[in-house]
């Protein structure tokens, strides 16, 4: 029997490369989470999940590791502190967290708390986010930057927040916004703190490249900046502009694109300073990416640079341009939301079932006893008997052709149902035999690599793809997926992951593998009377807020966890997932009204003696219990 150890598992899931030293596999074969890359302390995910289930917290469970979040904030700030020191940069760096990346109150409050020592700020892009930002800032005195489209109410709220002492900057995205600002400044007499968003020619890379460039949704072109300056000067507001902002897209995969944007943005800054504007801050926006697949490449699910390289380039490029222009260096702001929160949350859920055909009949005896077989079936029998590594390619192609032929013959009425079933059974036997041969061949012939798809099983997991990792469906984003136990054993199944929605799109067929993107996930056969859990990693950015309620599957249970030296971990907060009545309420159904209508219907049935009183009572109890229960599946 082939030996297998946890290092082998780490390789096939590429865990060491995407895990950022925050995830590992222990001697038991379970995935562990570390509070920081340098920490030897860890939490065993399988033990944690078992403990949560004992506490009646059912899967799917979103695990939020607050120490990891704190560590990510620290690592970004540490990288910039080091870059400032190495480059003798004369100004400061400040992190702003864009609330849109993860708007959950407890998460934003934690970021505000952990980020105090770094003077962290919040970036908001809508009226609800503005209100949330003001609320969080009220207890923490956090600075706020306001981006996005703005109406008069938005602008007036910012003005009055400024008047009563909030540190808040209103960024002008369009000229018509500036006209509204001027109008409201005259009306209220309140002097704002302003910023200007610049539309750079530079573009990012990957899925969000269109966020930058001449056709970008936001920002002022150079000619519009000149017009804005004239308008500001005419109305006595030019000295209120303290910041310029640019953003060339999220998850920028190539560092050279970042450098190009920094040079262009810094040139705009120096020119505006030469024109007499008192700009103090350059907000370089987001874009600091996450290496989701561990390839350290420019592929859209990876990045070809580190946080340290990013920080160094930001500081160096801006300083270099400013020194050449003889202009004072600005304070630098970045909005690195994805890199801050992606790693800290993990979704864990149980596998409910697989599509393994446990009741498939064995046709061995029937085939042996048959006096005459359909020609197609006979050819498949012959291939199965004779196949070896030297006839592999030809036999594989013949097998594919014959199974297609069997389907056509069945549809035309020339094969019976039993004969088609025999053909399918033989096809499966041949593919398994091919697999056993191919596993010993290195490298695998290219034309045979896809044959494994025929062996791929479907593992049905207790979650909604659309609710918990919508980017996997919407933009084909890769997220690392790993079973959290039995990693000291060799996986014996290749699988796809299907959710429990009634939608054929609710299936994951692209995974992070040892050599990049792969079409199957290695898993273990499900043992009887054993729970098997799968973890979805690096899902802390955008997924929670983008998740939708397809089939009315609601928010999952969420648990906030911190490390504890004595007990291993502490549960800080448990946030119950949506009950059925809560999901129904989103679409205007009310629990009491549902019960009332059903009860009235049942009473008519009782009166007509179609339903017994006991049946009516039991059904109402069952319905009531369902309304109060979790939207996801139990036993």
Curated annotation (Swiss-Prot):
PROSITE patterns for the chain: ODR_DC_2_1 (PS00878), ODR_DC_2_2 (PS00879)
Pfam families for the chain: Arg_decarb_HB, Arg_decarbox_C, Orn_Arg_deC_N
Residues bearing PTM N6-(pyridoxal phosphate)lysine: 100
EC number(s) from the headed UniProt entry: 4.1.1.19
Pathway(s) it belongs to: Amine and polyamine biosynthesis; agmatine biosynthesis; agmatine from L-arginine: step 1/1
Annotated binding of substrate, by residue: 282-292
Record's keyword annotation contains Chaperone: no
Cofactor(s) the protein needs: Mg(2+); pyridoxal 5'-phosphate
Major enzyme class: lyase
UniProt GO MF annotations: arginine decarboxylase activity; metal ion binding
Keywords: Decarboxylase, Lyase, Magnesium, Metal-binding, Polyamine biosynthesis, Pyridoxal phosphate, Spermidine biosynthesis
Reactions this protein catalyses: L-arginine + H(+) = agmatine + CO2
GO BP: arginine catabolic process; putrescine biosynthetic process from arginine; spermidine biosynthetic process
Functional note: Catalyzes the biosynthesis of agmatine from arginine.
Sequence similarity: Belongs to the Orn/Lys/Arg decarboxylase class-II family. SpeA subfamily.
HAMAP family: SpeA
Entry protein name: Biosynthetic arginine decarboxylase
Gene: speA
């Amino acid at each position: 029997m082939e030996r297998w150890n946890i290092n082998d598992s780490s390789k096939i899931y590429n865990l060491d490369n995407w895990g950022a030293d925050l995830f590992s596999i222990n001697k038991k074969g379970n995935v562990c989470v570390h509070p920081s890359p340098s920490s030897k302390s860890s939490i065993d995910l399988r033990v944690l999940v078992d403990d949560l289930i004992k506490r009646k917290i059912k899967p799917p469970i979103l695990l939020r590791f607050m120490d990891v979040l704190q560590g990510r904030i620290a690592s970004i700030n540490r990288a910039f502190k080091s870059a400032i020191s190495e480059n003798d940069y004369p100004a400061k760096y400040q992190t702003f967290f864009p609330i849109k990346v993860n708007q959950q109150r407890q998460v934003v409050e934690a970021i505000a708390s952990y980020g105090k020592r770094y003077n962290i700020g919040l970036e908001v892009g809508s009226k609800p986010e503005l209100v949330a930002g003001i609320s969080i800032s009220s207890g923490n005195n956090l600075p706020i930057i306001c981006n996005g489209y703005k109406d008069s109410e938005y602008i007036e709220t910012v003005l009055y927040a400024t008047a009563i002492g909030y540190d808040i900057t209103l960024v002008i995205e369009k000229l018509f916004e500036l006209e509204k600002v001027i109008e409201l400044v005259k009306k209220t007499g309140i002097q704002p703190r302003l910023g200007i968003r610049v539309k750079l020619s530079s573009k990012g890379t990957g899925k969000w490249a269109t966020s930058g460039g001449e056709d970008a949704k936001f920002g002022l072109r150079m000619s519009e900046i000149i017009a804005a300056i004239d308008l500001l000067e005419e109305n006595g507001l030019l000295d209120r502009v303290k910041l310029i902002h640019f953003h060339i897209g999220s998850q920028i995969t190539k560092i050279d694109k970042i450098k190009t944007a920094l040079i262009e943005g810094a040139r705009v800054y120096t020119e505006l300073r030469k024109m007499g504007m008192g700009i103090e801050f350059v907000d370089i926006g987001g874009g600091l990416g996450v290496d989701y697949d561990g390839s350290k490449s420019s592929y859209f699910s990876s990045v070809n640079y580190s946080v340290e390289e990013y920080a160094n380039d930001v500081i160096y490029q801006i300083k270099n341009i400013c020194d050449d222009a003889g202009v004072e260096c600005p304070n630098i702001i970045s909005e690195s939301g994805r890199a801050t929160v992606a790693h800290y949350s993990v979704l864990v859920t149980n596998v409910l079932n697989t599509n393994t055909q446990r009741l498939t009949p064995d046709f061995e005896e029937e085939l042996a006893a048959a006096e005459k077989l359909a020609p197609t079936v006979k050819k498949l029998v012959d291939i199965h008997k004779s196949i070896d590594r030297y006839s592999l390619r030809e036999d594989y192609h013949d097998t594919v052709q014959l199974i297609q032929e069997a389907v056509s013959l069945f549809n035309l009425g020339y094969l019976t149902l039993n004969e088609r079933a025999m053909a399918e059974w033989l096809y499966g036997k041949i593919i398994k035999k091919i697999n056993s041969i191919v596993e010993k061949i290195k490298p695998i012939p290219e034309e045979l690599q896809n044959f494994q798809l025929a062996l791929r099983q479907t593992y049905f997991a207790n979650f909604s793809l659309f609710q918990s990792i919508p980017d996997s469906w919407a933009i084909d984003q890769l997220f690392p997926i790993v079973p959290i136990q039995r990693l000291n054993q060799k996986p014996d199944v290749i699988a796809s992951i299907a959710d429990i929605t009634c939608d054929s799109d609710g299936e994951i067929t692209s995974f992070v593998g040892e050599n990049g993107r792969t079409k199957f996930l290695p898993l273990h056969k499900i043992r009887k009377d054993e729970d098997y859990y799968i973890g979805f990693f690096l899902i802390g950015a955008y997924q929670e807020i983008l998740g939708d309620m397809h089939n009315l599957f609601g928010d999952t249970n969420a648990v906030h966890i911190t490390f504890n030296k004595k007990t291993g971990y502490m549960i800080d907060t448990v946030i119950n997932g949506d009950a059925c009545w809560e999901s129904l309420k989103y679409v205007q159904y009310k629990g009491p009204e549902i019960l009332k209508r059903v009860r009235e219907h049942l009473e008519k049935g009782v009166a007509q003696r179609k339903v017994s009183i006991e049946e009516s009572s039991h059904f109402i109890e069952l319905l009531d219990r369902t309304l109060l229960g979790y939207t996801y599946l139990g036993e």
